[in-house]
A protein has these predicted regions:
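Surface-exposed, low-hydrophobicity beta-strand/loop segments enriched in small/polar/acidic residues
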Residues: 6-14, 22-168
């Protein structure tokens, strides 16, 4: 999920003995595997991807259910790390039939212009947003989650999206 190995130059320049350096790296790996084990035990899966900037009405992302079964999407997190939008730009997120289907039933009208923001469909769902949705199996009628830029351009938008789901 988040562990990144220390580069050889940085590893050499770290203080401490070789044993201490290796101990630190192994502890970081253990923390990561413990977190993955907990997620796996709960059956929760997390998909992530990169937000793309674009003009008004462009799609910032489109994620297709990769599973051979239906899934329940319990949370979508939008993490805007660089604001790059014209005042008034919004983001709608929701389930769709294709990679270019507009939907606002998870997040409706998220303001992506005022600040770096981490938002989700629970706290920041807007007027039409729901706490969860069900997607069809891959290739089904409704098997996408899309994020569409609305009203104004967000050409320099930078960030990630995270989709939390459970196979049904």
């Amino acid at each position: 999920m988040t562990y990144t190995a220390t580069g050889s130059g940085a590893f050499r320049s770290k203080g401490g003995s070789l044993s201490e350096k290796l101990g630190y790296e192994f502890a970081a790996i253990k923390t990561e595997t413990d977190a993955l084990r907990a997620v796996d035990a709960a059956g929760l899966k997390i998909a992530k991807g990169t937000l793309a900037g674009g003009l008004a009405n462009a799609f910032s992302f489109a994620w297709q259910n990769p599973e051979a079964s239906a899934i329940v999407v319990s949370r979508v997190v939008i993490d805007v790390t660089t604001v790059g939008a014209v005042a008034g730009a919004l983001l709608d997120v929701g389930p769709g039939a294709t990679a270019t289907t507009h939907s606002d039933t998870l997040i409706d009208g998220l303001d992506i212009t005022t600040a770096v923001i981490t938002a989700d469909n629970i706290t920041n769902k807007g007027s039409n947003g729901l706490s969860l949705c069900k997607l069809d199996a891959a290739g089904g009628t409704t098997d996408y989650i899309t994020g569409q830029i609305l009203v104004q351009a967000a050409a320099a938008l930078v960030g990630k999206y995270y989709i939390f789901y459970t196979v049904v």
